[in-house]
Amino acid sequence: MQQFKALLLKEWRESVRSFKILWIPLVFVLLGISDPLMNYFMEDILQAVGNMPDGFMMTMPEFQPADLLIASTGQFQTIGLLVLITAYIGSVSRERQNGTATLLYVRPMSFTALFFSKWIVASIIAIISAMAGYAGSMYYTVLLYGTVDLAKFLAMLCTYCIWLMFVMALTVAMSAAFQTSVAAAVTIILIPVGLLVDTLIGSFWNVTPWKLAKYGTGLLTDNVLMENYWYTLLVVLILIVVIVGIGIKMSKKNIRYLKV
């Protein structure tokens, strides 16, 4: 336990020292507030820009509060996930490549503690970022469009946090299994590309990890079959356990990549 606490503190200090605790949440805040503000002021922006043909008229769609939160989730699912993957894809492999891990591996060490420390800190940063992003989106949504059911919003937020734990578990596990460039390629294929594929042809199946965030937003509008939601949530939780186990095993197995 003492070793785990020391490793956890090390990872946390590294995230603070590299300002990940600051700039990643800031990115999510900017993504979160962009949709409510842009959609609300779009007509004014178009008028200010000018150069519109005479007689040109544009009817702006009327958004419901839930629509803006769903749009913000879409931003998090694209740009936000790429930022998180980029920030933590080298959490294990980069230490092996630059020799930093030598300071850890020269003494008896629990690879379980090592992996958990990296995954937990990455998940905490991801969850803080999502909460900050949704807070910004919620603030301007309520201010400009109307209220949102708080219980449904919290259910969606908790669901998205579990999804982020899955994403960060996969990211750190890929970093443990491969060298940085390969890990990045595999993770990007599995997460963002997987989401794209699920969006295009996902109507053929109802239960996949990539649908969890979508089902979470469906809680806002009561537009989700709860049976599919619970099965998907269960699949994601099981996969988290499996991926963490694989990550721990690969962390130990790939000591051979260590550069002294």
Region locations from a protein language model:
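Helix-loop-helix units of permease transmembrane domains in multi-pass membrane transporters
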Residues: 91-123
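Junction motif at the cytosolic side of a transmembrane helix
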Residues: 238-260
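Aromatic- and glycine-rich beta-strand/loop motifs that create alpha-glucan
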Residues: 1-28, 256-257
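Transmembrane helix-loop junction
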Residues: 14, 94, 107, 138, ...
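Central hydrophobic cores of alpha-helical transmembrane segments
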Residues: 24-29, 183-195, 211
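Secretory targeting signals
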Residues: 28-86, 90-91, 116-184, 218-237
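Residues that define the loop-to-transmembrane-helix transition and helix capping
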Residues: 22, 112, 181-182
